Amino acid sequence: MKGKIIPLNFQTRQDSETGHEVIRMTPPHIICHRNYFYQKCFTRDSSKLLFGGAFEGHWNYYLLDIPGQQAMQLTEGPGDNTFGGFLSADDKSLWYVKETRELRRVDLESLEEYVVYEVDDDWVAYGTWVANSDCTKLVGIEI
């Protein structure tokens, strides 16, 4: 459910090889992953992290409040491409592909969703849309 807050209990351990502290932020019994490394997944102040998780049985987007150790569900239902989404430069929106057809924008304050672009019926949106640094231009792949 959009807006649902999921409390998390970070687990900390020391890496046996390096001696560095390693923090697991998501529960071991839920499959979670980050988006592609070149997409903007941290807020500008580095306090929040965008990730994909299967808390509700299908992949959806979540925004992890690192200091608060909780995640807020941003999208719902099946069909989210949880690898190619990204946060806008101003940290006010999530951009992602739904059902391989629609580029969507989610307002992070209201959680309202807008279809920004829909792929023609003869094509499939591959799911990887990349923005320039200030999110004024996007490039997408259609196959």
Predicted region positions:
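Blade/loop signatures of beta-propeller domains
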Residues: 1-23
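Short, solvent-exposed loop/turn segments at conserved positions within beta-propeller repeat blades
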Residues: 5, 54-59, 96-100, 143
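Beta-propeller domains
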Residues: 14-18, 44, 48-77
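Short coil/loop residues immediately preceding or within conserved phosphate-binding loops
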Residues: 20, 37, 58, 82, ...
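A short beta-strand motif characteristic of beta-propeller blades
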Residues: 23-31, 70-76, 112-120
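Signature of short aromatic-glycine-proline-rich micro-motifs recurring in repeat-based ectodomains
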Residues: 33-42
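Conserved beta-strand and immediately adjacent loop positions that scaffold enzyme active sites
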Residues: 39, 60-62, 102
